Every structure is written in C-alpha cells, then in structure tokens.
C-alpha cells in the first residue's frame, strides 16, 4: 500500500509546488450535461403532513434547526410517509429536480445489484473473489492469500489495504486491489473501504458482461422511472460502484421506498424479500459509536431502521416502523453517520416517537411550512435568479480563449462607494488582471480529485458590466469561464472543465475590509456537487488585486486525510526521499497544504498593449 500512499503524497506535493495538470490516472471526459428536457417519470403523490399523521409544525421546526446550525449545509430535504411526499425543501441555490452527487450513498445500490445476481444464481455469497478474477493475480501469489468472499466485500471486512487513496496511483484499480496485502483475517474486522464496493461492481461486470449501470438500468432504474442519473467509471470502464453517482433527491427516495415495500414496485419484485431481510440486518459492530453495518448499508438509531449513507450528508433513511423515508443532500463538514445533521434528525424522530395514522388538517401550520420552504428555496433576499428550466442553458458561456470586449482600465470615483453595486461594476468593467501564481483552479480541490479533473491554472481574471449584468471571467488553460454574478440572489452559469460541464450559481457582494480596501466577495456554488468555491478579491492601489481563495467543506477534512497518510508513511524511505528532495518536512508539508487549500494570489492589471485583441468601439 505504500506505493499508493506515495502517489497521494506526490499529488499533494505537486499541488504545493504549483504543478498543474493530471495525475497518474488517465483522464477522459465522461460527465454528461444535466438532461433538463427529460420528462420526470413516476413522481410521488404529494400530501399534507397531517393527512399522513405528522404535524407540519414538526417539519417546520426541523427545517429551521437544520438551516440554522453552523455545522450543517443543507441542499435538499424530502420526507415520505405511506409512499407520499409530505415535505420537500430545496435550499438556495440548489434547485428542485437537479441531480446531486451521492458519494457513498450509492454503495447501497451496488449492494442491491449483488442481491439480484445472487437471485439469478450467477453469484454466491461465499465465493472467493480470487477465483472470480483468476487472471488478475498470479498463481504463486494466490497460494499465500486468505480467502476473501463476496460477503466480506459486502460487510467491509475484506482487510485489503488498497483503499480510496490508491485510486490516484494508476489505472488498474482491480489489479491493485487483488494483489494488495491483507490486514488480519477477512470477515473479522470492519474496515470501511470504498474499493470493496468497486470490486463488487467489477464482479457484476465479470458475471454479466455489462457494466453495473447497464445491468441495473432494466432491472432497477427503468422500473422505478429513474432516468436522470449518471454513474462514473474508472479508467478501465468499470462503474465505480462505491461513489461517482449523480441522482435526484426524489429518485433517492424511490430507492428507500422500494425497501419499505419489501422490494416490490408496481407489482414487480425488483429485489427479493430475502435479500432485503439479510442486507438490512446488522452483521457486525462498527467504529465511532454507530449502530452497525449490514450489506453496504448502515443501521440507524430506531429499532429496525437503516440508511444508505454518503459522506458530507447524502442519506436515505428508512424507518420501517413508521413507513417513512427521509432524504438529505448536503455539504456538511462531517463524513459519515456520526454527524450533527443526523443527530438533529434523530432528535425529531426519537425512538419513542410514534406518528398518528392521520391528524386533523391544519391549514395555518401547513401554510407556514410552505412559506418557510419557499423562503429557504429563495434564500435570504430571494437568493435565486433564474428558473431551472432555462437559466443555466442561457448562461452556459464557457468558451475558447479570445477577447471580444472593449478594454478599459479606468477606475472611477465610484470605487469609494462599494455599496453602490452598479457604480462599482462600471468602475471595474473592462479590466483584466494577469495572475502572478497560475496554478489555482475554478473548481474546488474536492471536485478536481474526486473526478480526476485537475486544473490547468487560472492565468487571468477580468470583469464586465454589460446591459445591467455583471460578469467575472476566469481564463483557465485554453478556456474562459464567464460567470454572471448575482447580488442579493445567485446567478446561474456553467464552467467547462476539460470537456465536462458543471452547473454553478454565483453570488457576489461588494464591501470594504478593515483597511478600507474595496473587496468583491464571490461564492461559486457547484450545484451538482457538495462543495462551494469562495474568492475574496481585494482591489489594491497601483492596479493590483489579491484573491484569497477558499472552499467549503474543505480544509479540515483534506488535512485529516493527509494526516492519516503521512502518519503511516513517516518511516518510509521513498516518502522521506520525496520530501527531502524539496527540503520539506512532514510538518512543513501540512502547513504548505493549508496554504494550497486557502491560497492568496496576486494579479496585475493587463495594459492595452498586452491584450491579444482590442475592440475600440465606443
């Protein structure tokens, strides 16, 4: 495993040293654009909470607390009871009906596929994975390997040391997993490892000749009416299985409702009752005081309850005793089950809570709940600018590099009044700045690493005020991301990252810092993801700017992951040589990584004679 960890250290070192470009893993664009025009199929019936036995006041209080907590960053919330949607809220600027990255929540879907394979008699729980993939490991090595079964993968007890960090080390993830060392006796100790799920996906492909996505489309996604989804593959074409799935919140709810209905949907048995029974049973204890683990899903606090769980707040919580499903998408700063968001939800649905069959309708409470959801969906000061049906399509303006606007480097006296947005916009319009340090990307590091889509580095930034609209343009490699900026409410746009288009919503604010320096604050939300990019642009004298970058959630988790790797590598010769070549200690590495996550870079005004082409029209 040291080789893979060194690859991570090498990637981190390249970031610190300002080296842009790829990793050891081949990149190819694969993410499709969100299918705006696709018709949504099999939507749930909507009902009032009271008609299904729960008070509107309960949901209103829950949503307020989730929104107010400094430890939560809510994106989508949905609640079902008896198969009907009784509460749904989309927190600005995340729109209703948009797919969202699910992270590890999709592991539970991979588990469903394994159950289907077993039902079709194409696989057995006790099969040795080395027998399934005989061509990926040499016969001599196999002699000294313990038996690792399909069930060990399902319960996260394989003990294989090749884990998530290894995916940056090369293209052959399956071969690396099968040839990696094993800690302990398989089946005895819970060690969460997303590559276990990846290998389950590879097993589906091995036994069927189809990718996991191809296998599930007619068996699961199609019957459920799930059409707006995308699941990433590895460089070898195997569906990632344990991460990389984009899915809409209501479709996540369908997957929970399917298990409430014992695997049956519209009269068709999609997942066997036997599989649901054994997969939702606790097979072993887990760390961090969670409630146990089944087959690719987690036990929850209420007796008999369980959840499909993904980091940063992607959850489908199933309460069989209440015939209820809850769905969350979020960008929290915490990883798994032991988090503030889930604790807040548990507070409102404790073990001793039992909803009624039906409650009297309460028009006032329901009206207040709907108003609250509207306020959260609009954000403070109505924080939405364009409709889902057309806003991003109109604002997709990433394009190949060229200059087509009149150049101006005048800053008027209006800069002295930054609260006057339009005066400030006019003052900076037409100005282009060349960045001194050109290794920062528009995408957060989380997006870059998870999708193996590394930045080419922002070289220029420019500002345009046109017909009452304000734009900030970032030149990154050969692409210009021209982002409309909303003030008071976010404006919808799109960025082109090496052929993959990511929808964003950009919110701006003009202010002054404690030294009376004008500042443009930008919050760039990647609305299909869990993360936001933040930039504070300081307009100094002498035609100079400084940009202080940040991302959320970010530094805490990135540094925690780095710490676990550097601790394991502290005595490794190659690792120490790698750092020694650059006179970097482990302590300095962490300090430099902090600066890489939250860099401050300067830019200098680009004069007319430096501009590629100048439009001189007045």
Regions found by a protein language model. Name each.
Residues 216-217, 221-280:
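Active-site-proximal binding-pocket segments
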Residues 1-95, 118-123, 363-438, 445, ...:
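N-terminal leader/targeting segments and the immediately adjacent pre-domain N-terminus
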Residues 276-328:
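Active-site Gly/Thr loop motif
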Residues 158-233:
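A small/polar active-site loop signature that marks catalytic segments
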Residues 120-158, 179, 210-243:
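Active-site helix/loop module of the DD-peptidase/beta-lactamase fold
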Residues 196-203, 241-264, 314-331:
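Active-site-proximal alpha-helical segments within enzyme catalytic domains
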Residues 432-554, 560-567:
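Substrate-recognition/cap regions that form aromatic- and gly/pro-loop-enriched pockets
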Residues 83, 101-126, 153, 200-204, ...:
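Active-site SXXK
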């Amino acid at each position: 495993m040291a080789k893979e960890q060194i690859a991570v250290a090498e990637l981190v070192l390249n970031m610190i040293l300002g080296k842009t470009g790829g990793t050891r893993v081949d990149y190819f664009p694969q993410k499709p654009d969100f299918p705006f025009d696709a018709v949504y199929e099999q939507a749930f019936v909507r009902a009032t909470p009271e008609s299904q036995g729960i008070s509107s006041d309960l949901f209103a209080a829950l949503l307020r607390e989730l929104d107010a907590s400094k430890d939560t960053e809510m994106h989508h919330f949905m609640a079902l009871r008896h198969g009907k949607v009784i509460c749904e809220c989309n927190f600005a600027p995340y729109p209703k009906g948009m797919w969202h990255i699910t992270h590890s929540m999709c592991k539970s879907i991979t588990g469903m596929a394994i159950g289907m394979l077993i039902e079709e008699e194409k696989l057995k729980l006790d099969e040795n994975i080395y027998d399934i993939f005989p061509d990926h490991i040499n016969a001599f090595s196999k002699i000294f390997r313990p038996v690792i079964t399909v069930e060990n993968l399902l319960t996260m007890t394989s003990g294989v040391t090749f884990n998530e960090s290894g995916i940056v080390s090369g293209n052959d993830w399956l071969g690396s997993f099968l040839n990696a060392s094993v800690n302990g006796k398989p089946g005895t100790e819970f060690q969460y490892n997303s590559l276990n799920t990846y290998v389950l996906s590879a097993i589906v492909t091995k036994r069927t000749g189809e990718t996991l996505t191809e296998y599930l489309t007619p068996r699961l996604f199609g019957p459920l009416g799930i059409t707006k989804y995308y699941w990433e593959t590895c460089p070898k074409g195997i569906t990632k299985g344990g991460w990389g799935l984009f899915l809409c919140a209501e479709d996540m709810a369908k997957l929970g409702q399917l298990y409430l209905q014992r695997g049956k949907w519209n009269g068709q048995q999609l997942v066997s009752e036997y599989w649901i029974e054994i997969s939702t049973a606790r097979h072993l204890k887990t760390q961090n005081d969670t409630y146990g683990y089944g087959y690719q899903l987690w036990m929850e606090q209420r007796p008999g309850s369980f959840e499909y769980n993904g980091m940063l707040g992607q959850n489908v919580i199933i309460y069989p005793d209440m015939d209820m499903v809850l769905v969350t998408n979020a960008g929290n700063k915490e990883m798994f089950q032991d988090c503030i968001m889930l604790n807040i939800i548990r507070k409102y649905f404790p073990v001793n809570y039992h909803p009624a069959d039906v409650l009297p309708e309460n028009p006032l409470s329901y009206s207040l709940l709907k108003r609250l959801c509207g306020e959260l969906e609009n954000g403070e000061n109505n924080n939405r600018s364009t409709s889902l049906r057309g806003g991003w399509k109109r604002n997709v303006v990433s394009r190949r590099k060229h200059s087509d606007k009149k150049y101006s480097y005048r800053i008027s006296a209006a800069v002295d009044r930054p609260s006057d947005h339009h005066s400030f916009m006019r003052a900076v319009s037409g100005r282009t700045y060349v960045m001194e340090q050109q290794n920062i990307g528009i995408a957060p590091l989380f997006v870059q690493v998870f999708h193996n889509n590394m930045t080419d580095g922002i070289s220029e930034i420019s500002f345009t005020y046109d017909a009452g609209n304000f734009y900030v343009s970032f030149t990154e490699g050969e692409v210009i991301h021209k982002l409309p900026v909303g003030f008071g409410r976010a404006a919808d746009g799109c960025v082109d990252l090496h052929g993959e288009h990511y929808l964003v919503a950009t919110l701006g604010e003009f202010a002054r810092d404690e030294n009376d320096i004008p500042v443009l604050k930008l919050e760039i939300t990647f609305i299909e993801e869990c993360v936001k990019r933040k930039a504070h642009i300081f307009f100094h004298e002498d035609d100079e700017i400084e940009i202080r970058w940040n991302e959320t959630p970010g530094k805490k988790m990135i540094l925690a992951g780095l710490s676990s790797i550097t601790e394991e590598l502290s005595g490794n010769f190659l690792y120490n040589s790698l750092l020694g070549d650059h006179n970097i200690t482990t302590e300095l590495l962490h300090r430099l990584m902090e600066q890489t996550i939250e860099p401050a870079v300067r830019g200098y005004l680009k004069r007319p004679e430096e501009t590629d082409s100048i439009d001189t029209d007045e």
